[in-house]
Amino acid sequence: MYNTTVRYREATPQLDVFSLLSHEQAVTQVVKGINKLSKVIDWELFREELESILGYAQRDWSKGGRPPIDPVLMFKVLVLQKFHGLSDEECEFQMRDRFSFMMFLGLHPGEAVPDARTIWDFKQALERDGRDGARKLFERFEQMLTEGGLIGRKGSIVDASFVDAPRQRNSRKENEQIKEGERPEGFEERSAKGRQKDCDARWAKKNKEMHFGYKNHVKVDAKKKLVTDYKTTEANVHDSQVFKELVDEKDEAVLADSAYLSEEAREHLLECNCEDFIQLKGYRNHPLSEEDKKTNKGTSRIRARVEHVFGRMSQMAMDRLRTIGKERANHHIGLSNLVYNMDRFAFLMR
């Protein structure tokens, strides 16, 4: 028979300021996820760069007008978004819903958070008129890592990974025109249809898998697994075509897979006074010798460390795009490399 005499503990009837403070203290005691970044990163490091990119440093504030949201706060919103692979709408909801997200942003319950449109506009502002904001912010953090002795350039690994864009449903004729660098009729940039079409992304095939989008070509510090440079291209661009743009005289040794092996690449390494550790490959009637195989085996163990970088990026959904166009792809890839470095930096500083 049902026992009506049992009494259970009741939930707190109403929230007050002390309940909220107690909840905040409980959350702050456990530092995990994105909040580990705030333990090791001084966000004010980016303020001057952000204000310069956005033109705030040159703006005449005496003319009035609605003041913008703090650019450092907006930058942290983008970091939060990339770290968790969120869309603009999802990011807005999660900032309102999750206390840990508000804590990361330095906000309190009840305070206004940037909406999806504001997030979109801020990303656009970083890249507008060739500002290349994501690149400049990446370089600012890379400079801090170098000055802190975390990037030694004793050995660098060069490799590339696909970043898939939303697939297009075009006719064969339209695809042929796009491949020739032309915009098909009705695909004008300002038209309703044109705004949904990516005429910059390209198809590529690797290991029997088809990819549509772009490539993230990176140079990674072999010891710390930090990205030191990157280049964005269409997916059909061969890895070897950007080798010279990534490798410079600052690198003491360079490791890469056999896709980068060419006389041009080796000449560039000689010009930069870099040790050559590009994987060797055999040819018809000229197979690899036992010594060559032994050399490849030794370097491949180190070169494989770059796959850990791409693996972590994939976990954070950085290997796919929600937008169209190369300019936005470049922003996504630049910010992805930056946020990966922040995550890696937090791991190294444990």
Residue ranges and their predicted role:
Residues 1-48, 52, 350:
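Charged, often Cys/His-bearing segments associated with DNA-binding zinc-finger transcription factors
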Residues 89, 93-96, 107, 114-271:
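Polybasic low-complexity intrinsically disordered regions
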Residues 272-273, 292-350:
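Basic, amphipathic alpha-helical segments enriched in Lys/Arg and hydrophobic/aromatic residues
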